Amino acid sequence: MEKEYNRSPQEVLEELGSCPTGLTAAEAAERLAKHGPNKLKEAEKPSLLQRFLTQLKDPMLLILMAAAAVSAVTNALSGESFTEVFIILVVVLLNAVLGVVQESKAEAAIEALQTMTAAKCKVLRDGHQVVIESSQLVPGDVVLLEAGDAVPADGRLLESASMKIEEAALTGESVPVTKAVGLLTGDNVPLGDRKNMCYMGSTVVYGRGKAVITAPGMDTEMGKIAGVLAQTEQEQTPLQRKLNELGKTMSKLVLGICVFIFIFDLVVAGEFTLDTVLSTFMVAVSLAVAAIPEGLATVVTVVLSIGVTNMSKQHAVIRRLTAVETLGCTQVICSDKTGTLTQNKMTVVEHTGPTELLATAMALCNDAALEENGAIGEPTEAALVNFAAAQGLKKPVLESRQPRCGEAPFDSGRKMMSTIHRTDNGFIQYTKGAPDEVLRRCTSYTESGQILPLTEEKRTAILAENKAMADKALRVLAAAERLYDALPDRQEPEDLEQDLCFIGLAGMIDPIRPEVKAAVAECRAAGIRPVMITGDHKDTAVAIGKELGIITDASQAVTGSALDGLTDEELDKAVEKYSVYARVQPEHKVRIVNAWRRKGAITAMTGDGVNDAPSIKSADIGVGMGITGTDVTKNVADMVLSDDNFATIVTAVEEGRRIYDNIRKAIQFLLASNMSEVLGVFFATLLGFTLLNPVHLLFINLITDCFPALALGLEKGEPDTMTRPPRDSKDGIFAGGLGFDILYQGVLITIITITSYIIGHCMEVGYFEMPKGVSDDGMTMAFLTMSMCEIFHSFNMRSQRKSVFSLPSHNKVLWGAMIGSLALTTLVLEVPVIANAFGFTPVSWTEYGVALALAFLVLPVVELVKLIQRRAARRAK
């Protein structure tokens, strides 16, 4: 049986039951039901049981299970109940279940975000061009391809206008393949030589074309090669990696302390019986449990997941978690002008030259389509098609009179495109592009129906008209023509774009987005440098830059040609002088980004075209455009703007700062709590009594502390979030005095807890004495006081330096978490069955009052230290 590449386009269309105008919506729906979505099969997701077992392999839970095993042996030998063992195992199981639930939620959130950035393609349905998700493609669909598009499925080419496709993912060959429509001979033509086919997994890098889908999903060549698409593990952020390293360091440190305490206790006991060894080992296990912040990883993951979801609701879709942290460090934002700083709603407001000829040239040398409700396509091209329609020149009518039969597609290097059309008298070429580039290739101009030589005087006059439009912040394009008796054999740009006849200029306005000016001001207040990059004329760029507040003077703008005259060393010295770059090409963007990065600045870069991919990859944060962006740029971007709006980047930066601040608050809270537990167990052991058992510490770590820590992750941004400079990306977890804060707060809670233990013991015996061994009343008081102390301390953590009583907003979730944790603590103490299981004694109102008074001390003491720190910071300035 002949392959698709051995048959003509018409034969392939007939076999697929399709036609050049595509399928109807009804046919497509019927085929979708039959063939299924155009997707590659994913690896099977692990079952709930597999996920649960994976959770149980966590080192922290293994330590807890070891503690349960030791406790079981101790209780069996001493004849005590296994209540403590049961409680530890319940905590382990609960933690594993919560881990599975959270993992499932995070996976669902990521899948939802992936849906938001799902690949789309242009397809003909019912004879009209529509944009659909690539997964909805079926055999027989006719797709339209242009530079920057990812080929959505395997297809036979119907048209190719200088189209080149990069097929490295399939063939390993990085050089793009020039595509053609003609048939191929031979039964087994190698995939890389099938020039009339296009394949899923490849990318259009130049030109445009049209293809009929022959194989979707797993029937594609990519599907045959891949078989099953392996799922990649979710990458960890730098913060998560630092926390993992911190966990390993803490584990080693605690192991050393445990060994010391184990030996110390045995030496003090003076006997080496099994019972003594086991009880001493349990003290060491208590210390290990106290030191491990069991809820920390979960809290960080949850806060990141919630933050990423919130950002997506604000039109910033995070594709890589690392971007969340990097956003908070951003120092420079390099942004395209069109569509990002402006509304991307182009309208022709001025023109020069013969109107009818200019409108015809602009409409035909154009890939936008005219539909009932206006033009569809790239906004600039759509504006030109609408301009022609307003003159009574509808594009479909023009195309029927002058059908396209050749072209040199747009290229950002040439800054123009050309198309060739058949006429009654031969062939005509229309060229449109940047005025200076088009004019440079012209030798004549048309006026009043005559073709006249292009003198220097006329050339100067045209450039003056261009400058006058550019000074009004208009985007200006020029049109030219060239006549042929016969269709040119060679249709390369260098062959077509010479000896042109100048027609005229069209000036378009793209209004500035109303919210961008305020966003630029917010950037400056936050210590972020906004930089505008555009292909427009320098005068246009300067006018818009001034209006937005990006620059104050034309000397702060530079052109791409001027950049070409600078070495990298010279650019490094000059890069801080410029905030507006005009007439730039994609390679200039890479140089600009790299110059800023060599300065040590964390840089974000936006882009939409296929040629922007290198600069987006070079930046610390690559930002793709969700509306106008190509699949290539979206795939390499760290973040995609679903509204193509500069203000969204600023919002994302603010959210990134807030998320990082909140994670630090949660870390400080949890580590200060763990510090107090470690110090408490350690010093209590040295003093000769048991402060708390492992099960008590587990309850505090997993129940009492986790809910407030999660609530801190939802804290609103502080008033100075966007008025302080970006943080240094090299800063560690404990930067900004966090390490000192954790230490002194841990010591404070330790002193309060041990004091409470001693008071509880003295109230039990009726006189003052230092406790020895185990005091049930002392342990109960220590548990109650430490729990309340850490609950109150979570309120302190709403701000690292500011007084919590000065914050303008309220964290209702934190209030709920504090009340909930307090209620659960009370439940453990007051419900007899649970209290007995934990080894607690009944608590009197007096003891409640003492514990409450002691725990409350954490608020004024921390507030006082914050006040001293604020005054010290002011003096330092």
What does each model-found stretch correspond to?
Residues 704, 779-794:
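Generic alpha-helical transmembrane segments
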Residues 728-747, 773-781:
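Membrane-water interface at loop-to-transmembrane-helix junctions
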